[in-house]
Amino acid sequence: MNKRIAALVLMLCMIVGAFAGTVYADIEKEAPMLAEMVADGTLPPLEDRIPTEADVYVETEYSPEETPVYGGTLRTNNGGMWYYGPFAEEPLFRLLDDGTVEQNVAKGYDLSDDGLVYTIYLREGMKWSDGTPFTATDCVYYYNYVLVTDVDNETGKVTKSNAGRYYNWYMTADENGVMRPAQVRYVDDTTFTITLYSPKPTLLQAIAIDNKWMFCPKEWYKDIMVNDASAAHWSGESDLKLIGGEGLPTITEEEALANALAKSELYNFENAAKLGDQLGYRYWQYAGRPTLRPWNNTSPLTDQTLVFERNPYYWKVDAEGRQLPYIDTIEFVSMDTNLYAQEKIAGNLDLVRFDASDFPIYKASEAIGNYRVATEILPNWAAVSFEFNQSYKDQQYRDLFANIDFRHAVSIAVDRDEVNEILYNGMMAPAQFAPAEGTAEYIEGAPEKWIEQDVDAANALLDGIEGISKDRNADGWRTFIGGEHDGQAITIEFETRADAPNDAQLVALLAKYFQPLGLQIVESNNTDNNTRNEKYYAGDVYMAAVNSSSGSFNVMLRPDAVAANRNNCAFTGKYGLEHADALTPEAGSDMEELVEATKALLSASTFEELQDAANRIVMSHYNSTWVIGILNSNKTFDAVANRIHNFREGFVSCDELRFLGNARPYSWFLAN
């Protein structure tokens, strides 16, 4: 007998009962701009735009206590695609602060008794932002034709160099221990199944975290995604069985690119892989692509201000039956980060997210700027850190980075109090890279390990490392002894981002602290986080990075920044299992333990196995200091215009919970 997940069903029954008969009674339960479009015949009535009365999503927890007001434009800074993307994200299931999931795009699910088959139920009558029906076909098509085409079915390896959009959380072990992708199949327009080879108790959490947009508009995509004999037929099944309905046309790469460009001049991509990555994974950036979000971009990415307009087919309503969102337009304004505070205080921006380094100026100007400073809670392992690529292509540097005495030496060379004062106005605290106190994974003493500055002890540790000199050359640097770099100064290049000015300042301070150790530090400045990530995907072409890893909200659910599963983790590099040419760690090495613990986590079929593997990963960091933490803080901040209502501060903010998206912007409204 199938086991219905009681929490989802109970919640659904309660909200349907409370909501029955109220949705369609009053035309004022939609934005005036939409009501005008209905009146002039350019938009269908509300009841034809949202799911059926039994299936519409009713937002009860975040409904405002005061009567909301429709309309207006909220202006905020453009912090890049990972700012405005999560801001309005709508996942299949939503992860909650306690690590459980709740219904969202999906209204519920069943799980078979053997734990292998998830049956997912969608909302009847739900539509994409262009008014076309949203069905299970869109989910099954996305999985089989957009996602797993990047995975070798026999090895589980990602087969394309830029395939960061595939996540290995759909992989489970078959009877021979081989990790294989799940099978996702169409049942009917509101139902599809996910079939695993072995149980994965956190599958829905994995979807909520790492493949939250497990859908795309098939009818819009089918002529712009390459489809040939090998595209999605790794399963050996027909188009009809995979997605229901008609089969898909054969599309060459040239045809896909031409068809995309014919849709819009904005879709001018150099190859099909880039097209799939941008329109399949980072789709929210592109005007014209249908979504399920409350607002959609209407601007070219090159515009200084990205204008996101309300989705007239948005499928959520508040407790009184008003269609969400309340705000008509969100504008994301690009400007120099140094101007954020000035523009906020002048009243030109409604919302600015900032860290501890800018707290004094924002706090002092609340009354002048007619705003309030609100707090977000961060579950960081570290807010400021640096790390070394354990797979760097040069063997002598790789051996140096792998030496734990080297990592401990550079850790205790850092004056953390000075970094705190110079970069963050003393608003943070010295800390090693470790789970914070108060979290389930906290280890007593771990945040204090190897953080007291001691230059003499650091030099003593370096003096004991074979292959590098104790003495300095004429310029004051230690050199390599033997090998290809014999007699050459040890020079370490740190990756930074131009759009994160504290990166460069931190590297300058590290250069100051490492100089007495005889280690030369230089900076490799990248234009932004995406450019830096391209080097991570390559795996072995960068040496070191600052402020790359913040840790993990929950290692069982999201180990990406602390384990060896991904192909873009800075310290693991090519030891990341997603790499098609992933390296095998040396037997008995610390990295071997991390990789094996990661494999155990990925193949775990019970919560006990998951917990054991997660504990091994945490202990690997405790014992090996893979990432060197400098400072930590459990807070970041928002300058919120007083005209923004229903903004609830104190929410947990992290990638897994989608940063500001966890404050449910669709429930905010503007009123003076």
Regions of interest found by a model, annotated:
Residues 36-39, 44-113:
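N-terminal lobe/hinge region of extracytoplasmic solute-binding protein
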Residues 60-86, 105, 203-213, 387, ...:
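A structural "hinge/loop" feature
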Residues 68-80, 107, 117-120, 139, ...:
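Short, well-ordered beta-strand elements
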Residues 78-79, 83-97, 208-324, 329, ...:
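Gly/Pro-rich hinge or "lid" segments in bacterial periplasmic/extracellular proteins
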Residues 108-155, 187, 193-195, 203, ...:
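Aromatic- and charge-enriched surface segment that lines or borders ligand/interaction sites
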Residues 123, 279-286, 308, 313-364, ...:
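Ligand-site clamp/hinge motif
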Residues 131, 340-359, 366-372, 515-574, ...:
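Periplasmic binding protein-like
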Residues 216, 289, 295, 304-306, ...:
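Detector for C-terminal structural segments
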